[in-house]
Curated annotation (Swiss-Prot):
It comes from Bacillus subtilis (strain 168). GO terms for cellular component: plasma membrane. This is Spore germination protein KC. Residues 1-20 form the signal peptide. A lipid is attached at residue 21 (S-diacylglycerol cysteine).
Length: 407
C-alpha cells in the first residue's frame, strides 16, 4: 500500500515538469525573419527592410533558385522615427507575428554607420528577447542595405544564407574578410581597449532586375552580392574608413585570423613569379617597453605549398627554395607593414596593439589608455618579421617550361 502511495505521489509530481503547450507557436502564425536591413531616409527617418521566409517556397531544400516562379523570401520595408516604431508599424503590412529567433544577418547602411554610429541600432537589437546576437553583422558598401536583403541569388535560395556562406568561404580561403556577429561588436565596444571592424558587402549590377526570379534562373545574373572589404569603426562606434584588397588581408594577418590565403612574390623582372598557398600560420603581437615607450614586434610564421610558378625555378634545389622563402617573407612583411601605416595614420587601434600592452604592462597602460589612439599609436614602432616555410612544391618539382627546356 505504501509503495502504491509513493508511486502515485511521484506520478503527480512528474506532471509538474512536463512541458505544456500554453506558449505554443504555430508556423502559420509566424513571420520568420532571416535578415534585417537598416537604412536612413533624407529626412532622418529609419527604414527597416525585413527579409521574411516563405516556407512553402523553400520546401524543396535550401539550394536552387526557388519553387518555380515563386520567390523564397519576401522583403517588407517600413519607415519610422526609430527602429521600435518601424517594427510596430510592420503589423500594418505583415499579417503574422514577427519572429526574430532565426535572424542570421543584420545589414546597416554605410552612411548611417558614419553619421549616427552603432549605439542606437545595437541597443534596439540587444533589448529584444527573441533576437539572437549571434547574427552576422555587415555594412552595405557603396549601396543601400535594402539591396543586400532584396537581391535574389541563384545558388542559395535564402539571400541571408548566401551572405553568410560567402563570408565563411572568403574568410577560409581568401583571407580578405573576417566574419563578425552582433555579440562580437558589443564585446569590443564594451571593452574599450580596441575598436570594432565589420565586413562590408556590396551589390554589383542592376538592383531592379536583381529582385526578380529571373535573376536566379539566368546563367549570367544581372545582380550579384559580393563581400567587399572591412569597415573600421572608432571606439565610439562610428564608421571612419575602409580597408580594401591588400590592406584588408594585411589586417586579417595582424588579427591572426588567416585560415588559408596566398602570397605572391616577384622574381627579377617576372611579376608574381611564384605563389604560395598558405596552409598554416600564426601571428603573434609581442609588446615591449623601451625608455618608457611601448613598441610592438609582430612575428608571423607561415607554412604553405607552392601553388603556381611563372619563372623556371629549379625547385628540387634546397637553395632555390630558401631564396623563394626569403622573397615570400619580404612580400608578406611589405603587405602587413602597408596596413600598419594606414592604421597609424588613421589613429584607430582595431587590431588590439593597446590590448596586448594592457595585458603585459597594466600599470604603464593606465598612463597611456586615455591618449592611446591619438598620441601613442601614430608614433608606435611596429616591427614586422615573417618566417615562411615551403612544405611542398605540389605534384611536381620543376615548372613545365623548365622541363621542356631540359628536353
Amino acid at each position: 500500500m505504501v509503495r502504491k502511495c509513493l508511486l502515485a505521489v511521484l506520478m503527480l509530481l512528474s506532471v509538474i515538469v512536463l512541458p505544456g503547450c500554453w506558449d505554443k507557436r504555430e508556423l502559420t502564425d509566424l513571420a520568420i525573419i532571416s535578415a534585417i536591413g537598416i537604412d536612413r531616409t533624407n529626412d532622418s527617418n529609419y527604414v527597416l527592410h525585413l527579409q521574411i521566409i516563405n516556407p512553402g517556397n523553400v520546401a524543396g531544400g535550401l539550394q536552387g533558385g526557388g519553387a518555380g516562379d515563386r520567390p523564397p523570401v519576401s522583403v517588407y520595408s517600413i519607415e519610422g522615427n526609430n527602429i521600435t516604431e518601424a517594427l510596430r508599424k510592420a503589423s500594418m503590412k505583415v499579417s503574422r507575428r514577427l519572429y526574430f529567433a532565426h535572424t542570421n544577418l543584420v545589414v546597416i547602411n554605410e552612411k548611417l554607420a558614419k553619421e549616427e554610429g552603432l549605439d542606437f541600432v545595437l541597443d534596439n537589437l540587444d533589448r529584444d528577447t527573441e533576437f539572437r546576437t549571434t547574427a552576422t553583422f555587415v555594412v552595405a558598401h557603396k549601396t543601400k542595405a535594402e539591396n543586400i536583403v532584396k537581391i535574389l541569388t541563384p545558388i542559395d535560395k535564402i539571400p541571408s544564407n548566401k551572405v553568410n556562406k560567402t563570408l565563411d568561404f572568403t574568410e577560409a580561403q581568401y583571407g580578405r574578410v573576417v566574419k563578425i556577429n552582433i555579440q562580437d561588436v558589443l564585446k569590443t565596444l564594451a571593452a574599450n581597449t580596441m575598436a570594432p571592424v565589420i565586413p562590408g558587402y556590396m551589390m554589383i549590377g542592376d538592383d531592379k532586375k536583381g529582385v526578380s526570379m529571373e535573376n536566379t534562373q539566368a546563367t549570367d545574373p544581372k545582380a550579384i552580392l559580393q563581400a567587399d572589404g572591412l569597415a573600421v569603426f572608432d571606439k565610439a562606434g562610428y564608421l571612419k574608413y575602409w580597408l580594401e584588397d591588400d590592406e584588408s588581408v594585411g589586417a586579417v594577418w595582424l588579427m591572426n585570423k588567416i585560415q588559408h590565403t596566398f602570397i605572391n612574390a616577384d622574381w627579377g623582372k617576372t611579376k608574381d613569379a611564384v605563389s604560395l598557398q598558405v596552409t598554416h600560420q600564426d601571428t603573434k603581437l609581442v609588446p615591449k617597453m623601451r625608455n618608457g615607450r611601448p613598441y610592438i614586434h609582430v612575428k608571423v610564421s607561415v607554412e604553405g605549398i607552392i601553388d603556381a610558378v611563372k619563372y623556371p625555378f629549379q625547385l628540387s634545389d634546397p637553395k632555390v627554395l630558401a631564396a623563394i622563402e626569403k622573397a615570400l617573407n619580404k612580400e608578406l612583411e611589405k603587405e602587413i607593414s602597408h596596413t600598419v601605416k594606414k592604421i597609424k595614420k588613421n589613429k584607430i587601434d582595431f587590431i588590439g596593439f593597446g590590448d596586448t600592452i594592457y595585458r603585459k604592462y597594466p600599470e604603464q597602460w593606465e598612463k597611456m589608455k586615455d591618449t592611446w589612439d591619438k598620441e601613442y599609436l601614430p608614433e608606435l614602432p611596429i616591427d614586422v618579421k615573417a618566417e615562411t616555410y615551403i612544405r611542398r612544391t605540389g605534384l611536381r618539382n620543376n615548372p613545365i617550361k623548365h622541363q621542356f627546356k631540359d628536353d
